[in-house]
């Protein structure tokens, strides 16, 4: 696991106001990078007119690039509120984009999630209120019955194998207390709410980290590969049913900022690592957030296994015309990374790929897995839910050719993705969008509209 950082400096007139941004990278050599958590800024006020220059690692950046990076979690701001520069206050988490506290998205070099997102302001760009792209006229169909709308995505029209290949099932006993120290490490605890993800080849676990505790931190962390199992000294992470999330991770974390999560295997038995949070393996989110499909093929949505390996291995398979809860963590009670609250991040894959292909590490040739085109951030902080969508850059420039819109009666504004562009109340851009849920519930609706 590696940890890299960058420093973003802001020059003001003849004096300098210090601003910091960092990329917290962690994972395997082929891991993607995850967004950073935000720190409270530290700004010195200087009277007189201000001229701003943004410097990251010696290279100048535009205001738009900086604000977009702060909003989607790729950059950290060290200073006071940046309202006057970007139009929104300091946000909440790593991995959480402009408004939602979700762990961040990741590029090829892996990274770590961040704290809750910033305010529900639209992205920095405010172009000339461009119109949404008009739906192209349907090409004339050959004689014969009309076929239902087909995916306009770069993915194959027909997935390999069955329509729902190895879709994880389970969740039995989700409210059953876990019998600490009684279950063999090799027996996946599916009777206690955990959902086995067998296609990863890890005995049902979503990730296994072999750790060595040095004082109060894990000095070395080795991530298991397919074919390995949960053995003594390992932390063994797991998935939960839609609407639920894992409750177990140790207080100790990696010496260079890596996250570690799951049950501990000691003397051949599984032990809870976070009893003060829960003695159940899976706990519910705050509720009130859903995903809904209006199309006739499966869509694989994958949550980052965080804290843990931080790979997108927690499947949320949305069936054709399906409707499921999307887990929304509460910032004040869920995982904290280096003292900062975190939220959930999800990867949206093109329709037609089952979780066995989409919810694991991929490669640049296909827009799935860590190369999926779109990320979703979800989290609640201070009683307000923050929901966002943003492109999985710089990992990929792939475009998701479908529509995702956040709908609900109590939203702070508009947030809609269509064919790689994001629409807000003030216009359209390519950097993402965020809304808060002022009251009621909200749903991410997937369609070919």
UniProtKB/Swiss-Prot annotation:
Region of interest (Disordered), ranges: 96-185
This protein's record includes keyword Cell wall biogenesis/degradation: yes
Recorded GO MF terms: hydrolase activity, acting on glycosyl bonds
EC identifiers of the protein: 3.2.1.-
Residues carrying sugar: 57
One example of a Gene Ontology biological process annotation: polysaccharide catabolic process
Subcellular location: Secreted, Cell wall; Secreted
InterPro entries: Beta-Glucosidase_SUN, SUN
Bias (Basic and acidic residues) ranges: 131-150
Keywords, comma-separated and alphabetical: Carbohydrate metabolism, Cell wall, Cell wall biogenesis/degradation, Glycoprotein, Glycosidase, Hydrolase, Polysaccharide degradation, Secreted, Signal, Virulence
Pro residues bias spans: 98-125
Enzyme class: hydrolase
Predominant subcellular localization, coarse grouping: secreted
Family listed: Belongs to the SUN family.
Its biological purpose: Cell surface beta-glucosidase involved in cytokinesis, cell wall biogenesis, adhesion to host tissue; thus playing an important role in the host-pathogen interaction. Has hydrolytic activity on linear (1->3)-beta-D-glucans such as laminaribiose and other laminarioligosaccharides.
Protein name: Probable secreted beta-glucosidase ARB_04747
């Amino acid at each position: 696991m590696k940890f890299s950082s960058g420093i973003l400096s802001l020059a003001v007139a003849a004096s300098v106001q210090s601003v910091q941004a960092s990329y917290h990278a962690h994972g395997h050599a082929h891991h993607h990078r995850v967004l950073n958590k935000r720190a409270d800024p530290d700004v010195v006020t200087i009277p007189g007119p201000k001229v701003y220059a943004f410097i990251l690692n010696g290279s100048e950046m535009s205001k738009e690039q900086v604000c977009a990076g702060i909003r989607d979690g790729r950059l950290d701001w060290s200073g006071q509120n940046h309202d006057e520069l970007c139009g929104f206050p300091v946000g909440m988490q790593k991995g959480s984009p402009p408004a939602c506290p979700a762990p961040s998205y990741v590029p090829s070099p892996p990274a770590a999630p961040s704290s809750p997102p910033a305010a529900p302001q639209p992205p920095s760009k405010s172009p000339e209120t461009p119109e949404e792209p008009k739906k192209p006229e349907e090409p004339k169909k050959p004689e014969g019955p009309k076929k239902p709308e087909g995916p306009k995505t770069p993915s194959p029209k027909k997935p390999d194998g069955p329509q729902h290949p190895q879709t994880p099932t389970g969740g039995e006993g989700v409210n059953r207390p876990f019998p600490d120290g009684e279950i063999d490490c090799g027996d996946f605890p599916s009777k206690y709410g955990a959902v086995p993800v067998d296609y990863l080849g890890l005995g049902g676990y979503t990730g296994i980290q072999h750790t060595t505790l040095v004082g109060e931190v894990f000095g070395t962390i080795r991530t298991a590969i397919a074919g390995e199992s949960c053995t003594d000294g390992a932390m063994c992470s797991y998935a939960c049913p839609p609407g639920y999330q894992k409750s177990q991770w140790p207080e100790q974390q990696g010496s260079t900022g890596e996250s570690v999560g799951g049950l501990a295997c000691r003397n051949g038995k599984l032990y809870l690592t976070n009893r003060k949070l829960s003695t159940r393996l899976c706990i519910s989110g705050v509720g009130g957030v859903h995903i809904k499909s209006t199309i006739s093929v499966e869509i694989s949505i994958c949550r980052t296994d965080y804290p843990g390996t931080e790979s997108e291995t927690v499947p949320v398979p949305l069936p054709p015309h399906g409707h499921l809860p999307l887990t929304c963590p509460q910032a004040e009670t869920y995982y904290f990374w280096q003292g900062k609250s975190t939220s959930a991040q999800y990867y949206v894959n093109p329709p037609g790929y089952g979780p066995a292909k989409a919810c694991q590490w991929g490669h640049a040739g296909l827009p799935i897995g860590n190369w999926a085109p779109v990320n979703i951030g979800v989290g609640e902080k201070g009683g307000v839910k923050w929901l966002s969508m943003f492109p999985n850059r710089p990992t990929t420039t792939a475009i998701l050719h479908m529509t995702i819109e956040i709908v609900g009666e109590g939203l702070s504004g508009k947030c809609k993705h269509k064919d790689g562009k994001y629409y807000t109340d003030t216009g359209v851009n390519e950097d993402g969008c965020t809304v808060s849920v002022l009251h009621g519930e909200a749903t991410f609706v997937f369609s070919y509209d």
